[in-house]
Amino acid sequence: MRAEKQYTRNEVEETIVRWKKLKESGATEHDNTEYAQLCDVLRSAQSEIEARRDLKGHIKRCFSSVDKNTEKLILKQQVLAYKKLSQNLPAPDDCILSVLLRLSKDEQLLQSIVKQPLQNSKVDGKVRRDFGSCQITPSAKQQRKYLQYQISEDDAIKNRMFRRMSDLESYPAVMRDVAELKDDNERLNLDTIKRNALVELKKLRLIKQQESLRHQVMHCQPHLRTIVNAVERMSCRRPKLVPQATRLTEVLERQQRSDRERRLKQKQCDYLQTVCAHGREINVRTKNAQARAQKANRAVLAYHSHIEKEEQRRAERNAKQRLQALKENDEEAYLKLIDQAKDTRITHLLRQTDHYLDSLAAAVKVQQSQFGESAYDEDMDRRMNPEDDRKIDYYNVAHNIREVVTEQPSILVGGKLKEYQLRGLQWMISLYNNHLNGILADEMGLGKTIQTISLITHLIEKKRQNGPFLVIVPLSTLTNWTMEFERWAPSIVKIVYKGPPQVRKALHPQVRHSNFQVLLTTYEYIIKDRPLLSRIKWIYMIIDEGHRMKNTQSKLTNTLTTYYSSRYRLILTGTPLQNNLPELWALLNFVLPRIFNSIKSFDEWFNTPFANTGGQDKMELTEEESLLVIRRLHKVLRPFLLRRLKKDVEAELPDKVEKVIRCQMSGLQQKLYYQMKKHGMLYVEDAKRGKTGIKGLQNTVMQLKKICNHPFVFEDVERSIDPTGFNYDMLWRVSGKFELLDRILPKLFRSGHRILMFFQMTQIMNIMEDYLHYRQWRYLRLDGSTKADDRSKLLGVFNDPTAEVNLFLLSTRAGGLGLNLQTADTVIIFDSDWNPHQDLQAQDRAHRIGQTKEVRIYRLITEKSVEENILARAQYKLDIDGKVIQAGKFDNKSTPEEREAFLRSLLENENGEEENDEKGELDDDELNEILARGDDELRLFKQMTEDLERESPYGKNKEKERLIQVSELPEFYQREEPEKTTDLLQEEPLGRGARRRTPVVYDEAVRDAQWMAEMDMESEARPTRGRPKRNIASVDETPALTLNGKPKKKRGPAPDTLTSEHRSLLRRVCLEIYKAVNELEDDNGRPLNKLFLELPSKKLYPDYYMIIKSPIALDAIRKHINGTFYKTLEAMKSDLMTMFNNARTYNEEGSFVYEDANKMQTAMETKIEELEEDGTLATLRGMEAEATSQLEDRIENEA
C-alpha cells in the first residue's frame, strides 16, 4: 500500500479555495475530474481527523476507568515487597500476585486499545508504529510459569547432587587391585579418577554448611544498609532482659529520695525569702531617708544656682558696660566700673600699664632735657588741668608747646596743601617744638613726601633752620623725591648724592663745606660713604620707607645709631606694623631711644602682662583685657605716631576694588607640581642623558611658586616641551595665569584701561616680555636692575596721556615704592608677596591722591596650590596690622615645631578650602562681569569672547583645549611615576639663546648690595626670543654679581691629595657614621634628624646666626663626604660635634632638640666603637699616617 501524500497548511488552504471556486462554477464529480479528486482528498483528511479524535477519547476513557483505591493497594504491596527484598528475604506471594494481576490488567487494556478498529488506514498505520515500538512486559501467567520453572530447576539440581553423592559413595574404597591388571597408563588414569571422585564427594557433602553460611550472610546484609536500618529500626532492636522486681525497687527508691530533697530545698527557700523580705524593708526605709535628704539638697542647690546666675548676669552686664566704655574711649567711666567690679586681673593690668605710662612720661622729660631746659611746665599744666587726668597729662608732656599752623610756607610753591596735610605739618612742628621725634605713618598715597617737604620749608622759613637736612630714601624712590623737591621747593639748595664713585667724589667738597640745605641719598650710600656723611651734624634725619628699620640688628640701623648724629629724627612709613609688635618697637626705639629703650619692658607691659603669675600655662587675655591693652598702646603711640587712612581724609578718592581670580593649572603644571611636592625635584627627559632630574631645587615652596607662575622658568622643561623655541602659543598654553591674561588683556586694552602688572620674579617678567612681543603689544618694564635715570623716563612715558603704552611691568619690591602712576586704573598682582604690605604699596601706585577713576585690583592665584596658603598667611598679617596689637599673637616666640608645622601646612594639598564667590574656574561670562565697569563694557567683552571662540583654534569642542592637557605632553610626563634617575642636571645660566636667565635674589640686604654694584658697572643688554623690542623702556640686566661688585669667577674642584684606596675607605667609614646619625629614631618612630638636615632660615631665625659662630648641618656634611673636603676622619667627627654643640647652645637644656643632639652624639660614638672593634679604623689610621708622612716628605723636598 503506497503512502499517502502529506499536505502542508498552505496546500490545504489552496485546495479548499480551488474546491470552492469549482463548486461555485457548477462543477460536479461526474462531469469534472479535478473536482472529483479534490472531493476525495478532503474526505480523506476529514476521516483522518475524526479517527484521531476517536482514538484520543478511547484512550482517555480506558485510563480514567482505573480505580484509585486499587492503585493505593498496589503501592502498599510494592512497599512491603521492597522491604522484604532489601533484607534479602523472599517477597510474599500475595504481593507478587497483586503486581502480576495489575500487569495483566494493563496488558489487557493496551491490547484493547491496540485492537480498537481504526477506520483510516493512515491513522491505523501510525498507531501501530507508535505501539509497535513499545516493549510490552510479560504477562502474569508467564511470570508464574517462570517462577515454577525456577523452583523445579532447583529441585532437579538438588536431586542430581544427591544422586551423584550416592554414586560416589558406591564406588569401591580400594581400586588398586583392579588397577594391577592394567598397564601403567591405565593405572595412572585410575589413580587420578579416584582422587577426583573423592574431592568431588567432599565438596558435595559441604552443601549444608554452604546453605548455612549463605543464610547468615543474607541475614547480616540488611544491617549494613543505612536506608533500610532507618526504616526498620524496630526490627533491629534487641530486647533487654531486666528483672521487673529490681527495676520497680529502684524507681521507688529514687522517688523517695527526690521527695526528701524537695522538702529540704523548700525549707531553705522559705528561710531565704524571709531574710530577703527583711532586707527589702530596710532598703525601703533607707531610700526614703535618702530621698528626703536629696530633696533638701536640691532645694539648696537651686537656691545657690539662682543666686549665682543673678550674679553672673550682673557681672556680664557690668562687663558689657565696661567694654562699651572702652570702645567709646571713656576711660573715666571705665575706671568707675572697674572699682565696682573689683576684677583683680584688670586692676593689675591697669596698674601695670599706668606704671609704664608714668615711666614713659618721665622718659619724655629726659628726652626733651637733652636739648636744654625741658619744654614741659608742670605748674602750668597743673593750673590748666586741676583734675588728675593721666591721659591729658601724658599727651601734654609730649605736646606741651602747641603751635597752630594755618597756612603753608611761602617757599612751598608746587601747589596748595590739603587740610589733613596741614594738620600733619602742625603735628610735626609740635614734635619739633617739644624736642621729640616721631613716625608719620599715613596710608600710602596720602602725600607723606609733600608733608615732609612742607616741614623742611617751614623750618627754613619760620624757624630759621637752614639745615643741613638728611633725607634717606630707597633707590627706587630717589628720582621721585628729586622731582617733588624741584616741583614744590625749587628754592631749596639740595644735593642728590648718588651715582658712580667719580660722581660722588665730585660732590665731596660741597658736602664738606655744607653748601646745601638738603642732602638726598639712599640707604646704600649711608653705609658706603659713612666716613664723609657721618661727620656732619644734621638738624633733621628723615628716613623714607622706614619699615626697613624694623630689624634693630641690621647694618643700616647700627650705622645710623652708632655713627650719625642728628637733633631730630623722622620716619616715614605706610606700614608701621607689618608683622608683630617688636618691629613697631624697633621703629620707636630708633626715633626715641631714651623713651623706648627696652624691648623687654615693652613686651612685658603690652604683650605678656600675666606671664610671671606663677602658673605653668600661659594665661590668655579676654576680649576686654585685649581691648584695654590696645587702648593703652594707642595712648603710648598717640604722641609719637600719626596715621591717617584714605577713607578718613579723602572722601573724593575713588573706590579701590580687589578681586581674587583663581586660575586652573595646565596639564604640565599639574605634573611638575606633583613631582616637586612628592619627590622634591623635577624630572625631565634629555636626548643625550635620558631621564634626568633638575638639580639645585632646594627651597620647595619657592619652586612650587615658580611652577604655579610658569613652567618655562625651568629651562630644561621648556626644551622638552618646545624644542624648537618657536611655538609661541606654548607661552600661554602651559600656564594657567598666562592663559587667563591672554583672555583679559585684549579686553582691557580695547576698553582703554591702563594696567600696572606686578611680579615677584624677574624670570617671569622675561617670559612675559616674550609673550608681549608675540602678541605685538607695547609695554614698559621696571625692575631692580633699572637705572635711576631710566626710572624717571619710564614714569614720564607712562604718565603721558598721548602715549600708546597701556601696560607697565614692574617688580613688586623695586616698583612698589615711591612711584606716582595715577594714570593707571587697573593693577594686576601676578603673584602675591609673603608680606602683604608690599602688595598694598604696589596697589597704591595707582590708588593715590589725584586718581579720578575707580581702581580695580586683580590678584591671580593658582587654584589648589601653595599660593592659596600664602594668601591666607598674608591676610593674617593684615589682621594684626588692623588691630595694631593682639594679645598672645605677637610674642615672636614660636617654637621650631610650630614653624615646621606651618611649612608643612603650605605643602599639604588636602587642606580645607574656603567658600568664596571667586573660587574655582571662572567661565567667560563670570570673567566679563568681573572685568566690566559698565553695561557698555560688558556688551563689548561678550562680543570679544564670541569672536575669540569663533576664530581661535583652541577651546572647548575643538581639537585642543586652551590649556595644554596631559595627553599633549611628551610620553615621559604622561607616566604616573617617573623612572628613577641616575643623573642630575645642573641648571645652566643661559637658555636656548633666546632669553638670559638672571638669578633672582630674594634677600633684601643682598639686593641692596647688588643695586650698589650695578651703579658702578655697565650692564649688558638682555636678549629675548628674537623679536626686536618696540619701546624705549627696555632695561638692561647684569650678570650675577658678588657683594663687592665683581663678577663671579668659576673655580674648578681642588685636586684630591689622597689615594683612591684611602679616599674610598675614608668615604665608606664616614658614610656609615653619617647613616647611624641620620637614620636615628626615637621610641615613637620620630626621626631625630629633622631639624639637623638643613640650616635654619635667616629670616625666621636671625638670632641663630648671631649666637652660633660656625653653623653647619647634615646636608653640608654629606656634601663634604661625597667630595674631597675631608682628609681625615677627625675632620668629619669635628663637624658633627660642632653641629651637636650648636644645637645645645641655641636651645635650652631639657628641650627635645637638646636631647636629640645628645642621642645623635651617642649614636655616633657607638658606631665609632663598632668600627674600632672590627679593625676598620686601625686600617684607616694606618693610611692616614702614611699620607701624612708622604705630605711631609713632599713639603721638605719643595723646601
From Swiss-Prot:
Main localization of the protein described in the UniProt heading: nucleus
GO biological process: chromatin remodeling; heterochromatin boundary formation; mitotic sister chromatid cohesion; positive regulation of transcription by RNA polymerase II; transcription initiation-coupled chromatin remodeling
Native organism taxonomy: Eukaryota, Fungi, Dikarya, Ascomycota, Taphrinomycotina
Record-linked InterPro entries: Bromodomain, Bromodomain-like_sf, Bromodomain_CS, Helicase_ATP-bd, Helicase_C-like, HSA_dom, P-loop_NTPase, SnAC
Domain Helicase ATP-binding: 429-594
One Pfam family hit: Bromodomain
Motif (DEGH box): 544-547
EC number from the UniProt entry: 3.6.4.-
Residues annotated as domain Helicase C-terminal: 740-903
One GO CC term on file: RSC-type complex
EC class: hydrolase
Main function: Helicase. Component of the chromatin structure remodeling complex (RSC), which is involved in transcription regulation and nucleosome positioning. Controls particularly membrane and organelle development genes.
Disulfide bonds: none
Region (Disordered): 1017-1059
Subcellular location: Nucleus
UniProt name for this protein: Chromatin structure-remodeling complex subunit snf21
Binding site for ATP: D442, E443, M444, G445, L446, G447, K448, T449
GO molecular function list: ATP binding; ATP hydrolysis activity; chromatin binding; chromatin-protein adaptor activity; DNA binding; helicase activity; histone binding; histone octamer slider activity
Bromo domain location: 1061-1171
Entry's family note: Belongs to the SNF2/RAD54 helicase family.
Entry keyword set: ATP-binding, Bromodomain, Chromatin regulator, Helicase, Hydrolase, Nucleotide-binding, Nucleus
Quaternary data: Component of the RSC complex composed of at least arp9, arp42, rsc1, rsc4, rsc7, rsc9, rsc58, sfh1, snf21, ssr1, ssr2, ssr3 and ssr4. The complex interacts with histone and histone variant components of centromeric chromatin.
Residue ranges annotated for the HSA domain, each copy included: 256-328
